[in-house]
Amino acid sequence: MKRLLVLILAVLTIAEGAFAAKPSRPAKEKPAKATAPKVIRPKKIERKKIERKKTPATKSARRTSPSKTVQPSKRATAHKGVETTVSPEEIKAARTELIDGVSAIRTEGLPGSFICVAPSAFGVVAGRNWDGTYHPVVAAAFYGKGRAIVFGHGSFFETQPFQADTAQMLANAVAWIEQGKKGPLAVYRWGGAAKVLAAAGVEVAEVNDLDEAFASPALLAGAGAFDTPEKRQQLFDYIAKGGGYMTSSIGWGWKNIAQNYTGFSCLALDFVDEKVLAPLGIVATDLGIGHTGDEGYLTSVDFPLGADLPAALSIAEKYPDGIPEETLRKQVSKTLTMAADAYPPDDSAAYAAFLELAQHPLAAKVPSPETPVTAADFYARVRIVLEKNRWLADPVRVWPADPSAATYPGLMAKGAKPVKGVEIQVETDERRWHSTGLFANAGDPITVHVPESALGLGLQVRVGTTDDDISSAQATWIRSPVVSETIALNKTTQTFSSPFGGFVYIVVPFSTPKGNVVQVKVDGAYRAPHFKRGRDTNKTWAKAIETYHAPQAEIEGYRMVITFPSSSLSSLTDPEWVTKFWDDANDLDVSLTALPGPLDFKQRVCADTQLTAGFLHNGYPMMCHVSADGNSGLYDKETIQAHGVWGVLHELGHNHQNGAWTFGKAAEVTVNIFTLYCTDKLLGIKPRDAFGEWMSVEGCDRRVSDWVARGKPFDEWGAGPDNGPFLALETFTRLQEAYGWELFEKLFAQYRQPGADLPKNDQERMDQWATRLSEMYEADFADYFEAWSWPISSEAREICAKYPKLENEQLFRLLR
């Protein structure tokens, strides 16, 4: 439900330069002016010895004793000519040193995870994936004479106060990579981390020059600092000679940003962190990873067998016809698939092992609803992600149709005739995807022509509407995990085919200069049913849906575009009304969230046969399942008018939600202020009538009474039994009943004011609801939010206490 929102709410801390999705050759870094390093002396930190209680782990979280055929006593690996031989005993001793005095670590945001792909790399602290598998949230590696360690989130060493035993973990990590050498840790262009590490007892020196950094025994730098092969080789040489390297990487965060802003989001090809980490024996995955206990990431949770690539390969070799035990099978399949997906293609032993798996006879399985590819099919999963990366690495060629294209997005009807010389006018004032009304059939070549004057604008052509990569998000695949591609329009003529096909879009990135009008010509694609508000009528739509036999169709308004199977939209009779409805909904959301005007791109909704999660989620595009109940509410006038359309209005709300007034527990709550606002303003359906029993006075009062009887636990506000977000939504529904929509309109506008005092954490977000409303209405709102068990701070309480008590007893109904 909150794929994009989590980017706003998670404190996504990426080191300067670490975000490097670069489809073209990177610009050379300007040489920094040499300055004396700023040394920050550490605060003294007592090295506490904590008695580590052995937390009972689940079966899948406990390392079992492998047979001798699976666990070698000593193994070697080579990367770029550097051989590193490490024994299991040395790795065990290293992990013991790193977690000495540490029972758990914790930080803000959702950290990413890693897979160790070489025997010289090892997991330090485990996290738990959504499916019960385990991978490192902190990983480390021996490399030549040196050492490296990577954390799954930069906020581990950027945020204070420290949570759990994070300070001790950081001190241990720096000591381990320094190997007893004297000298400060060089912190390269990462000022916030320097101060925080000093508070953890580490002596640091801030530097702006890499040569200066390499003069220290150890350095902290974002992987983006090494964005050329030459810089990376410098780093590898430095570590191999005995240097220490510490960094962070968030594969899932980078991927989400890249999908939304560059279009090039393949970990193995576009993520610079992989090019830094993989030669060290580690790859970053595209999954955020969860805690292993209430305190955070527990060091007492051991890694299960199969959590690293060498062990997973050994197990796969031991069971060539399939792994019999389910937990082990799931762990090994996850490790092999995610490692193959993230590993940059090279001539290493690890990549050769992936290629060998992909050539196994069982690898030929094609995902479809009839032949789903499950965790047991790890040979096929590895083949599919390798083929995907091979395609995306060389998209401008004629690729044959993939057999799974018939499942999604579907194939053109036989006998359809391709177009030639269709002109598309693209105005760069409108960002993101421009619909062409053309469909590329899987395996059929299309040619795109742009004028020479447009080559410097950064335009792209995209084939395919869905942006859901299900590689690691779904245990079972019924379609290929990635079916869309983006190609830079850096030549006047390019001919290519997509293995999967899909709608053709011309993409205007946010970096493209505005004020340009470009004529693009397309050959070889097929016309599809495409309604465009202001150009077409209900009558022309009826003719198009009857004439053009593409598997997908689009209806496009001024603010939003809906992409659905043609078979679904064939019943649509009034696209003029439907597009206006969604345009108006977008305008209302923009107004409520207090943006200065319409967005410079159109929102999108796409129906897919398999999503990353659930049946609906937000993002660009918003995604819904082709069989989701209520989909007709997206495009059927009578259904919308009679019942509203909660689902997509909810997801559209996520796209306009403001993280400044949404704290973590409220992510699925405040979004529905938008849902109710649009339902009321557009359809005249009042909040209490908007969603049956879930919003009725009777239903809400029952939930409140039950919650009060349980002692009003704040942990259940927004996520308790039998209420989902609807108990928490009552907090805001009562405010709307008492003060009208004006309360939210005025309140949200305050957060957009220049120089507004914006909250920095969840405590301040909650506090500002109370203080801002108290100042707006000159009444003490702290009482109200505390009646809902919000932990309002004493400082905020003091501000609110300047005003008289609220006297509206309906606000406090059943609460006291």
Regions from the PLM with identified roles:
Residues L9, T13-G17:
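Hydrophobic core
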Residues G81-R95, T107-C116, W130-G132, K145, ...:
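Helical hinge/lid and interdomain linker segments adjacent to catalytic or ligand-binding clefts
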Residues T133-G144, P551-E554, L773:
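Short, surface-exposed beta-strand/loop micro-motifs that present aromatic residues
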Residues I289, G296-P403, Q552, E556-S570, ...:
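Activation corresponds to long, low-complexity, non-globular regions
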Residues L305-Q331, T337, D341, I562, ...:
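Active-site-proximal alpha-helical
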Residues S348, A352, E356, A363-M412, ...:
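Beta/coil-rich, acidic/histidine-enriched accessory regions frequently appended to metallopeptidases
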Residues D394-A528:
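Beta-strand-enriched, solvent-exposed domains that form extended recognition/catalytic surfaces
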Residues W541-E737:
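Catalytic cores of extracellular degradative/oxidative enzymes
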